[in-house]
C-alpha cells in the first residue's frame, strides 16, 4: 500500500515540525494546516502512516507522534520527497570533549529541511560530550557536516587527529594549528607536527533530537 499525496504531505509536516520544535504537531494543528474541519480525517491518515511503519503514536499524549527510523521507510515514498528535504545518513559519533575513535555508523537516515543548514550538509554526526556547549552544541545533538578538506581560521570544523575525530573551533596562526573548545572546562588541543591531521568537514547546523 502506497501513501497518498496528502499522507506524504502530512509526514513531511510532522518531520519538519519535530526538527524545528523538538515535538510533533498536535492533531488539531495538522487539521488546521490542511484545512480539515476536524481531527477525524487526521486520525485516518495517521492510522495509515502508522500501519506503513512511518510513525508510531504514544497513547495519551497530545504531541505523541514519533518518527520511525527511516531505514524502515519504503524507498518509493522517499523518492517522492520534496527537493527541499535532505536525506542525510548518520555516520557515527564525534567528540565534543576529548577526541574519540572513528565510529562505524548508526545505520540510520534522517529527513531534514534544507533551511536548517548552511551550507548543505553531506552527513550527520552525533555529538558526544559538551566541550562546544557555549556554541550551543550539546551532548546528543546531531550536527550537519559539509564534507571538505578546506577551512579557515575561526570556523567550526570536524577534524581528524591520527585516527580520532573531534568537533572544535579551528585557529590557525603562522606556526601552529589549534582546536579550541567552547567551554572553559576543556583545554585547547595543540596539533603537533608529528600527528596525522586533516579537516574532514565544516559544521553547518544541528538537530536536537527530542529527549
From Swiss-Prot:
Q: What are this entry's molecular-function GO terms?
A: DNA binding; serine-type endopeptidase activity
Instruction: Give the DNA-binding residues.
Output: 27-47
Catalytic center at which residues? Answer: 131 (for autocatalytic cleavage activity), 168 (for autocatalytic cleavage activity)
GO biological process terms held by the UniProt record: DNA repair; DNA replication; negative regulation of DNA-templated transcription; proteolysis; SOS response
Task: Note the site residues: Cleavage.
Answer: 96-97
Q: Which InterPro entries match?
A: LexA (IPR006200), LexA-like (IPR039418), LexA/Signal_pep-like_sf (IPR036286), LexA_DNA-bd_dom (IPR006199), LexA_repressor (IPR050077), Peptidase_S24_LexA (IPR006197), Peptidase_S24_S26A/B/C (IPR015927), WH-like_DNA-bd_sf (IPR036388)
The record's annotation in Pfam families points to: LexA_DNA_bind, Peptidase_S24
Disulphide bridges:
none
Q: Which UniProt keywords apply?
A: Autocatalytic cleavage, DNA damage, DNA repair, DNA replication, DNA-binding, Hydrolase, Repressor, SOS response, Transcription, Transcription regulation
Q: What Gene3D superfamilies does the annotation carry?
A: Umud Fragment, subunit A (2.10.109.10), Winged helix-like DNA-binding domain superfamily/Winged helix DNA-binding domain (1.10.10.10)
Q: What does this protein do?
A: Represses a number of genes involved in the response to DNA damage (SOS response), including recA and lexA. In the presence of single-stranded DNA, RecA interacts with LexA causing an autocatalytic cleavage which disrupts the DNA-binding part of LexA, leading to derepression of the SOS regulon and eventually DNA repair.
- Name of this protein: LexA repressor
Species of provenance: Xylella fastidiosa (strain M12)
